Amino acid sequence: MRKIFFVLFLSLLTSCSDDKKIDEPQITIGDNYDKKAMLVNWAENIIIPAYKNYQIEVNKLLEEVNTFKQNPTIDNLNKLRVSWLNSYKAYQHVAIFKIGKAEDLYFIGHSNTYPVNIIELNKNINTQNYNLTSLTQFDKQGYPALDYMLYGLADTDNAILVFYTGADALKYRNYLTDLVTDLKNNADLLLKDWEANKNTFISNTNNTSSGSVNLIVNAYIEYFEKHIRLGKVGYPAGKFSNGIQPNKIEAYFRKNVSKILLNEAISASADFFNGKYYSNNQTGPSLKSYLDHLNVQRNNKLLSTIISDQFSLIKIKNNALDDDFVSQINTNNNKMLEAYDAMQINVSYFKVDMLTALNIAVGYVDSDGD
């Protein structure tokens, strides 16, 4: 019955799409793929190791904050900045997995909402009256807030240091500490939750909206579409506005690490698709091997190969960008739009071809018509 239903589903989908002239994926019907093995690989070799590394980097960040708090020097400020970037890069590998506790904690919102609301952030500092666990605090905390605190308070390092040594130094030091403590608390909670519920995640192989594969695949595509394609590139490039918005780049005050963070996120997405272990180059059961098992093709070419080739093109387009996205947007925004378009192609492969082949429905709100 399941095979018959799926054939009817594909027939209906094809008939509804004739006017759009979209090439449908060619699929060998019959899904006996070992989803449990894939879930084991995801949990044990990718997700949990990524969270462990993230926790390590956040702990280092807190250590550097405490050192700087006790001895606010230029040298300690620079060490703190290095740790901030390392932690920010590690975050790109765990933000993908917005399911369960990460969704409950609004992990992405608390960690990486930008641009920063500078006026309200400074009000937090001055009044010392804030609760960073509140949903109203997203744009006053996380890595973007640290970006402002470490790079945006003034134009020079010496001038920035005055905020941490002057009359209101304690307020600034406390806010800096609270920002990182909030990141640490969430990192600890998320790793603990994954370790405690790993077996439940692995055993949930049902092909339903609450099944582990469905949840992860939807989270994966949503993050790629909304937070990488749109958040890191589309919004600042003015894709859905009347003009460019360079103030909306990631790490606006540091500026020349936006490409680093974008490339880190793209690598994390490509690695997950291929089932690459977080800690080494070994690979295991994955979306790629799942699609290959089903022999999913587009124009007589394996869909997994098409997606992988597109990831390579995305990296080429991204590497052509200036390290400083503000400069890139202001001087030649077309390159930003080309990078966006390259990512959009994989969004289409994910949402049209891959989800159809895996018989998974889109489980999040699609707000921009893709």
Task: Locate each region found by the language model.
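C-terminal motif of bacterial Sec signal peptides marking the signal peptidase cleavage site
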Residues: 12-15
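Sec-dependent signal peptide recognition
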Residues: 2-7
